From Swiss-Prot:
Gene that specifies this protein: recA
Database matches in InterPro entries: AAA+_ATPase, DNA_recomb/repair_RecA, DNA_recomb/repair_RecA_CS, P-loop_NTPase, RecA-like_C, RecA-like_N, RecA_ATP-bd, RecA_C_sf
NCBIfam families membership: tigrfam_recA
This protein's name: Protein RecA
Taxonomic lineage from the root: Bacteria, Pseudomonadati, Bacteroidota, Bacteroidia, Bacteroidales
Record's keyword annotation contains GTP-binding: no
Family recorded in the similarity comment: Belongs to the RecA family.
């Protein structure tokens, strides 16, 4: 067994010099600019719930971490904006302030209200170009007043030079440079202000790729590096009521995660006009974890019959908030135990 090292005079001098340096750093840059990890126990990560039980658990910390950059990307109409709007609604439920930078100029007020967003307490900007969008986002972040900012989308952050140029002008690399410069400036401010910054991104196909995945996201590589979490979202099988399509089963995969293990997956229903189906998630996860019993077409929880058929069971849970909360907590506990 190695003997415990006794501090020497030289060590004491070093510690004294370090103390003086840290005091100077804190005086210049503020309290908490530098800290000893051994002297300060790392607190649990503060989060904003995603609006999906399964995704909260796949993220490993119960939601989107505060003070971090999140990238949500996927094909068109896969549920990217829906996922981001649910996060805004969850932040507002906890008393937080939210803002959306609508670079696509396509924000749907009615749909956001249906998903639980208080639009009267939502700040929205519809900028003319990418520089303006990112400048607005940076100023909101530096105010430390906003809990969550959604930028929809990276592909729509068109550089000013491209907008003012002629059709067909070659502006190679402008978009990537804009994103790289903005993220270098914003990252530190996001961390200090504890703001969750969600970038929605689109997929493109690389030309001439014969082997491997030809898909790539827009805006260069900067966002891939600066994002603490990257979520790939895809729509799967349609949800039908007879012949009418009511929504889609949606699959998400956490491809990058700096706060918990990556590569976890989640599935949930996105119903048109309603967003993520919480009751559907409770049924599916409950059956998977043996919390809800399925016998033939009947679903039951303990002595409570939930209904015959998935839709009837969903309706029963949707109409009983107390039961929904109880099942949600049991599901969270079961998955935590599974991952521990």
């Amino acid at each position: 067994m190695a003997e415990e090292k006794i501090p020497t005079v030289q060590d004491e001098k070093k510690l004294q010099a370090l103390r003086m340096a840290t005091e100077k750093i804190e005086k210049t840059f503020g309290k908490g600019a530098i800290m000893n990890m051994g002297a300060n126990t790392v607190e649990d990560v503060s989060v904003i719930p995603s609006g999906s039980i399964g995704l909260d658990l796949a993220l490993g910390v119960g939601g989107y971490p505060r003070g971090r950059i999140i990238e949500i990307y996927g094909p068109e109409s896969s549920g990217k904006t829906t996922l981001a709007i649910h996060a805004i609604a969850e932040a507002q439920k906890a008393g937080g302030l939210a803002a959306i930078i609508d670079a696509e100029h396509a924000f749907d007020r009615t749909y956001a209200e249906k998903l639980g967003v208080n639009v009267d307490n939502l700040w929205i900007a519809q900028p003319d170009n990418g520089e303006q969008a990112l400048e607005i986002a940076e100023q909101l972040i530096r105010s430390s007043a906003v809990d969550i900012i959604v930028i929809d989308s990276v592909a729509a952050l068109t550089p000013k030079a491209e907008i003012e140029g002629e059709m067909g002008d070659n502006k190679v690399g402008l978009h990537a440079r804009l994103m790289s410069q903005a993220l270098r400036k914003m990252t530190g401010a996001i961390s200090k202000s504890n703001t969750t910054c969600i970038f929605i991104n689109q997929l493109r196909e690389k030309i001439g790729v014969l082997f491997g995945n030809p898909e790539t996201t827009t805006g260069g590589n900067a966002l891939k590096f600066y994002a603490s979490i990257r979520i790939d979202i895809r729509k799967s099988t349609p949800i039908k009521d007879g012949e009418e399509i009511m929504g889609h089963l949606t699959k998400v995969k956490v491809l990058k995660n700096k706060v918990a293990p990556p590569f976890r997956k989640a599935e949930f229903d996105i119903v048109f006009g309603e967003g993520i189906s919480r009751s559907g998630e409770i049924i599916d996860l409950g059956v998977e974890l043996d919390i809800i019993k399925k016998s033939g077409s009947w679903f039951s929880y303990g002595d409570t019959k939930l209904g015959q058929g998935r839709e009837a069971a969903k309706e029963m849970i949707r109409d009983n908030e107390e039961l929904a909360e109880e099942l949600t907590e049991k599901i969270r506990e079961a998955i935590r135990n599974k991952h521990s």
